[in-house]
Amino acid sequence: MNPIDPQVAPWEHPGAAPETPCTNCYCKKCCFHCPVCFTKKALGISYGRKRRGRKSAVHSTNNQDPVRQQSLPKRSRIQNSQEESQEEVEAETTSGGRPRQQDSSVSSGRTSGTSSSGYTRPFKTSSGSSGSACKH
C-alpha cells in the first residue's frame, strides 16, 4: 500500500475521484456513483441556496376571503321563489301541458364505450430518459 502524502489534499489522492464525471441522471447506478452523488441524489441533501416558499400576507391573519355574515333579506327570497315558479308554469304551458322528458343517457351523463376516468398514461419514447448524458 502506498503511503499517503500529507502535502496532497484528500480529494486529490489517486483513486479518490471517480473515473467518470458526475451526471444529472438519477438512476440507481448514477446515485451510487460517488459519495457526492449519493448525498445529492440518493439522500437529497443539498447545501445550496434554499428555495423560497410563498410568503403569506403580513397584515392578514388568514388568507381567506371574508364570508358574508348576513343572509338574504326575506323579501328577496320570496321574490326569487315566485320568479322560479312562474318560469316553471311558463315552461309547462309552452310544451303542451306536460313537462318535457330528457333522454336517460343524456341526463345521466353516460356515453357508451368510454372509460369513466378518461385518464391515459403518457407514452414513453424509446429514446430513454430525458436526454441526459448517462449511458449504461
Swiss-Prot record:
One of its GO terms (cellular component) is host cell nucleolus. Residues 48-136 are annotated as: Disordered. A motif (Nuclear localization signal, and RNA-binding (TAR)) lies at residues 49-55. Its main location: host cell. InterPro entries: IV_Tat, Tat_dom_sf. Residues 22-37 are annotated as: Cysteine-rich. Belongs to the lentiviruses Tat family. Transcriptional activator that increases RNA Pol II processivity, thereby increasing the level of full-length viral transcripts. Recognizes a hairpin structure at the 5'-LTR of the nascent viral mRNAs referred to as the transactivation responsive RNA element (TAR) and recruits the cyclin T1-CDK9 complex (P-TEFb complex) that will in turn hyperphosphorylate the RNA polymerase II to allow efficient elongation. The CDK9 component of P-TEFb and other Tat-activated kinases hyperphosphorylate the C-terminus of RNA Pol II that becomes stabilized and much more processive. This is Protein Tat. It comes from Simian immunodeficiency virus (isolate TAN1).
